[in-house]
Amino acid sequence: MEDLMTSYSFTEKKRIRKDFGKQRSILEVPFLLAIQVDSYREFLQEDVEPNKRKDLGLHAALKSVFPISSYSGNAALEYVGYKLGEPVFDERECRQRGMSYGAPLRVTVRLVIYDRESSTKAIKYVKEQEVYLGEIPLMTENGTFIVNGTERVIFSQLHRSPGVFFDHDRGKTHSSGKLLYSARIIPYRGSWLDFEFDPKDALFTRIDRRRKLPVSILLRALGYNNEEMLAEFFEINTFHINPDEGVQLELVPERLRGETLNFDLADGDKVIVEAGKRITARHVKQLEAAGVAALAVPDDYLVGRILSHDVVDGSTGELLANANDEISEDQLAAFRKAGVDAVGTLWVNDLDRGPYLSNTLRIDPTKTQLEALVEIYRMMRPGEPPTKEAAQNLFHNLFFTFERYDLSTVGRMKFNRRVGRKEVLGESVLYDKKYFAERNDEESKRLVAEHADTSDILEVIKVLTEIRNGRGVVDDIDHLGNRRVRSVGEMAENVFRVGLVRVERAVKERLSMAESEGLTPQELINAKPVAAAIKEFFGSSQLSQFMDQNNPLSEVTHKRRVSALGPGGLTRERAGFEVRDVHPTHYGRVCTIETPEGPNIGLINSLAVFARTNQYGFLETPYRKVLDGKVSDDVEYLSAIEENEYVIAQANALTDAKNMLTEQFVPCRFQGESLLKPPAEVHFMDVSPMQTVSVAAALVPFLEHDDANRALMGANMQRQAVPTLRSQKPLVGTGIERAVARDSGVTVNARRGGVIEQIDAARIVVKVNEAEIGGGTDAGVDIYNLIKYTRSNQNTCINQRPLVNVGDVIARGDVLADGPSTDIGELALGQNMLIAFMPWNGYNFEDSILLSERVVEEDRYTTIHIEELTCVARDTKLGPEEISADIPNVSEQALNRLDESGVVYIGAEVRAGDIMVGKVTPKGESQLTPEEKLLRAIFGEKASDVKDSSLRVPPGMDGTVIDVQVFTRDGIEKDKRARQIEESEIKRVKKDFDDQFRILEAAIYARLRSQIVGKVANGGPNLKKGDNVTDAYLDGLKKSDWFQLRMKDDDAADAIERAQKQIQAHEKEFEARFADKRGKITQGDDLAPGVLKMVKVFLAVKRRIQPGDKMAGRHGNKGVVSNVVPVEDMPYMATGEPVDIVLNPLGVPSRMNIGQILEVHLGWAAKGLGRKIQRMLEAQTAVSELRKFLDDIYNHDSAINAERVDLSQFSDEELLNLGKNLIDGVPMATPVFDGASEAEIKRMLELAELPQSGQTQLYDGRTGEAFDRKTTVGYMHYLKLNHLVDDKMHARSTGPYSLVTQQPLGGKAQFGGQRFGEMEVWALEAYGAAYTLQEMLTVKSDDVQGRNQMYKNIVDGEHEMVAGMPESFNVLVKEIRSLAINMELEE
């Protein structure tokens, strides 16, 4: 049992989850962002020495395009290596300034010029140079990219793997419903090659899905003639022609099977098969046994058979018959006459040897290779006159050259496996023995030498005809063995290669000049196309998305997303049901639950928790090995293709203490089916019960009790939870909350172990353990700067809070600070609320939610949102716009929040419509009235040639200004506010660096003191030779004088020298870093063209929960808050405690998400146990008793294989601390598919001294009467979703109108109105409310004169309206006239 105990880190000791899992975890949850981080690391290969780089990523792309030779061949540009520079701005600066985070790519190339005169290509001269090839975006630690100041994620694509696929049309093409088989060779890049049957059983080919050609044309173009084609595809029967009558057949008995002969088949006198009877397998065996080698058959048996070779008269050389002719009686007579001894015919029959290629040859118009090439040229380039050269080049470039065609390693591996070859490696072009043997360039000779006698195209056609003949099966394209994942790195490489190919064309042009004019590589290469391609991909590709940053879970899930859409993938409209459906191979690779609802359902998936990609890009999942019924801890990853061969048991298969499978028959999966097998036949077993689901679904407790549709909503809605002001860990979790928070990157984790030295709200300083300190200038101090109140992509607030205190001892990986939605390093998306399931005055009709006022008072669901408002001053034609506090026609009061530069103060509380940045725009000269002229004359020019264009707070928003940033264009003088911000920023950075240096210095001196105190000195300030160095002596010395000590001991002397060097090195480094930072702060900003100044104002908006906000549990139980009721009116328990939330019980049965009920019961038990611990602590119970109670909670009912909680590791103090943290409730973990059972929940309720039914008597808060039956009450983790009524609701009086129809716009963003749609019109019609209807359709909508007149009437106090002609009617008239139908209104 001991080996199942785990040791706890500092953070974990603060709070331990009671785990109900029966299976101990074999594999820890892997690093969740690995698919992104690893893929991009392989693309960059930044830390790999140039000569050791693998053929991947940037290196592979550069290698494939270089060397570039000039057209004459006298100059070439070769690739040597590349290196990435340092990024100019770090991540934080890029976010602030709206820049992209990337590093410059410098490629070393070598220009080689050959001597024209010499025949041996002697080198004239060589020049090597570094060339800048644009910025390459860098990935942040958390797997995101910063593009133009915003964080973006590039998610992976699931696309069809390159290779060869066989399929049929499911009988849809032809009216007879006949299955037409087809094959398609898909390369990684290059032309697709299809083969397909038509209803008449002829075989055709298509190139790039153009019009079809008989397949024999393609083979003829490769160099095969009719005889060779027939010999490749058919077996041949040989007939010997007797000179006078009859024919001898060389008999292969097997080939007669299924035939019906019109003569007796006999062995000597013994008749084996009578005439007219069908020959069966038994007859064939008899013939083989009898050893019949030849068979005499009548002439008419030969007539109508197909010749395999041309038949020539030996004496005259006359052609008697062509290959593929059906033999006629006349031809047979001619053969006899010419003395032809033997002829070969094709062995075909209707059952399993179809004459497909023979049929095809009959419809093939071409006779020679050139004709075939010309035919292909005409199909690819219709309308262009073909020449021999052009036709040959076009055909060669289609499939046989690396520049234009690439199967890739994956494609070649899939291709070879499918056509039944053993080796997985090979060429990335299509190889054909005949075609390459006829060419005599170097490359062709190499290919022929390596691959000799194979042919890719012939083998595909052979497999296709086999399938048509009924041997072999077609492929399933939704099988994950036929779909592979393309991750960031690979897509970036493809884009980079595309950019390089564009560069290559330009370089080729210039290389010829390089010879004559002596250009350098830098002058030859223009990096623009590469940079443009990369920028386009990262900025606006379909797969590059604005990161979903609502909470840590949404970040992690977004990065683990796998999409079938995007370039080279499917489109929403064309994707059918099969592609979207769950496939057996998804098990353990792609989540079967989490996918968006709506048009993208099934096309966008999430990786399963343990899934990873293999070297070929196929998804694989881990399994434990099983040998002779014993389950081992060895883990092996299998891809969908490999898994096909094995029998795999479920993770919850029963095992005993020795890990032997105990059941007689174990439930297993084999080749996509579920079945029962004896333990001896099992090969593997699942690693974990949550193997099938993704991270989001694995966070839903009791998932196994929820209906799949609701589980999907539950998983999706957790990603929309808004981080609350104070996060609360879920009382009922699943045990992977810690892993999600750790990998999301929102918490601060210790890089090295040590002791907390110093701490404040924005910084944590750790003094590192001696053992973990590196050599050199490493001073053994880690400084962590925390993120304070920053805006996320979704306008939620990112803020980190320290968790540790000075003096705490921490280990590597411990959580030092919590981020948004985390609580002591665990994901905490919502709040634990006391919930009752009961109706309450109709306020929970249709899933509405009734809240207690206490929830609002305690700020349980208060969230902070940070809005960024931008004001831009541009240079206009009439003059520059100006940011200032001097704004025409605005009251003093409106400006009282602005400083003299016209920018709002930090800390100002602003409401909708308030001015935040004053800005004036010059306006054109207009005709002045006499009054204005007078004002001009008195007050000078400035009075009215500018208009107010200030930045105001948008309607419906109020908040506090928390930050202001002013960006000024280079070369324009900064205003006072900008200078102030700059100075304070420099001060802050200086203080930061000073503090860091001081801490480092102190640490170095402290280490030095420990190394020299008590040692003998040879001399020093006020110290005689032979004296010992004491603490008191050192305290009396100035720090800088320590280095004057001369020590007797060499080690001590080295320590002093080393310390001095370290301090000097750090001082230098900090000075350099500060100078760099200072330069960045003071330099001008790189703003968009025409922009002089930009001011960003950040508003913090506090949103309390209110009716209209959307909330949800984790089981898809969503609803909208309908009412907030005073706490005294809420139902309460016998103890007097009122409930927080009342939910509708009718929302449970029909939705079948019973998990929420179990969660409520277990949550109540968890809270009850916490209260019990609180009572024990208040009563100051002995620690031993508390220890016993905790042991009873954690370890009472652990299963054989489950992990136990070892409380003996806890000192009494730590145990009391743990107890204090459990007062709020003992957190539980019920892992997915391995959770708490009903009995365990009941036991927990019993231990907490709560009713085992989970129900209790409630009383009505308004009357005090008991309700007529007991109610289910308990704690549920409830979330507030980012669908807030404040963001959705707005009011419009007069606003913008659409240009053509003159009807009000719609939507909050356009400040639009409410649409009065056709259904609403029907309602008014039904009531006969004619005048209301007229008003709705005219003056309140698009009757322009009418609505203006009505406004005047209201101003004048006349309450009447005249309805005119709606503008939409005029539009209709114009539309009809555009159809040339005149329509006039009669007066």
UniProtKB/Swiss-Prot annotation:
GO terms for cellular component: DNA-directed RNA polymerase complex. InterPro entries: DNA-dir_RNA_pol_bsu_ext_1_sf, DNA-dir_RNA_pol_bsu_external_1, DNA-dir_RNA_pol_su2, DNA-dir_RNAP_su2_dom, DNA-dir_RNAP_su2_hyb_sf, RNA_pol_bsu_bac, RNA_pol_bsu_CS, RNA_pol_bsu_protrusion. Pfam families: RNA_pol_Rpb2_1, RNA_pol_Rpb2_2, RNA_pol_Rpb2_3, RNA_pol_Rpb2_45, RNA_pol_Rpb2_6, RNA_pol_Rpb2_7. Keywords: DNA-directed RNA polymerase, Nucleotidyltransferase, Transcription, Transferase. It catalyses: RNA(n) + a ribonucleoside 5'-triphosphate = RNA(n+1) + diphosphate. GO terms for biological process: DNA-templated transcription. The RNAP catalytic core consists of 2 alpha, 1 beta, 1 beta' and 1 omega subunit. When a sigma factor is associated with the core the holoenzyme is formed, which can initiate transcription. This is DNA-directed RNA polymerase subunit beta. It comes from Xanthomonas campestris pv. campestris (strain ATCC 33913 / DSM 3586 / NCPPB 528 / LMG 568 / P 25).
